[in-house]
Design a protein with these regions (language model features):
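Juxtamembrane helix-loop-helix connectors linking adjacent transmembrane helices
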Residues: 2-11, 15-17, 28-100, 113, ...
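Alpha-helical transmembrane segments of multipass membrane proteins
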Residues: 19-27, 56-64, 104, 121, ...
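Transmembrane helix-loop-helix hairpins at the membrane interface
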Residues: 82-197
């Protein structure tokens, strides 16, 4: 199914990731003090970062599975019709989630956060998600609530970056997006009209 003009395409997501990586490398090279890129590889040992990110992903996936398989909980999930039109077939949730995790964490956490701080970085991160908020709901209240949640996620990911490291922030961010998109795909499949046999 071709994407509508309002829904993000896979190509657009990958290009955005590449743009964010290029901006992160440029901003770090131009604006960070020497030695450059130290924030990119500092933090806790990689094994600890991988373990914590993996545990987070397992807990998140378990929670999503419970919600999707308990009818009383699943009925509480409300997905706007505009989000139901996003093509999430095949490996798209994985590609989009990994691209967002890598590109956004390199730009917003590794590059910008050391320059502007945790809170301003989280606000910039939320502002970068304004288009997604517009896809989600026509209501200004719901859009604002979504952006506040994204800002809170930006603070949480910023703390992960500061206390654990970039690898953990990338993997936690990617797991949120991948699991969220796969859950959206599941909800969309259940909501799709059944074809007559």
């Amino acid at each position: 199914m071709p994407p509508s003009p309002r829904t993000p395409s896979l190509k657009g997501q990958v290009l955005t990731c590449l743009l964010f990586v290029a901006l992160a490398v440029s901003a770090t090279a131009l604006l960070h003090p020497s030695p450059k890129f130290t924030q990119w590889h500092s933090g806790q040992p990689i094994s600890l970062q991988l373990s914590i990110a993996g545990a987070f992903a397992v807990l998140l996936a378990t929670g999503a599975a419970i919600v999707l398989h308990v009818p009383a909980l699943c009925r509480l999930v409300r997905v706007p019709a505009t989000l139901m039109t996003i093509d999430l077939s095949g490996t798209r949730p994985w590609i989009v989630g990994l691209c967002a995790g890598i590109g956004e964490e390199l730009l917003f956490r590794a590059s910008l956060q050391p320059l502007v701080g945790l809170w301003v970085g989280a606000i910039i991160f939320a502002a970068a998600h304004a288009r997604t908020a517009m896809l989600g709901s026509p209501s200004i209240v719901k859009r604002s609530a979504y952006l506040l949640n994204v800002a809170a996620a930006g603070v949480a990911l910023g703390l992960v970056f500061e206390h654990l490291g970039l690898v953990a922030a990338i993997l936690i961010h990617a797991s949120i997006d991948v699991i969220g998109l796969m859950a959206l795909r599941s909800v969309a499949a259940r909501s799709a009209p059944k074809s007559a046999a």
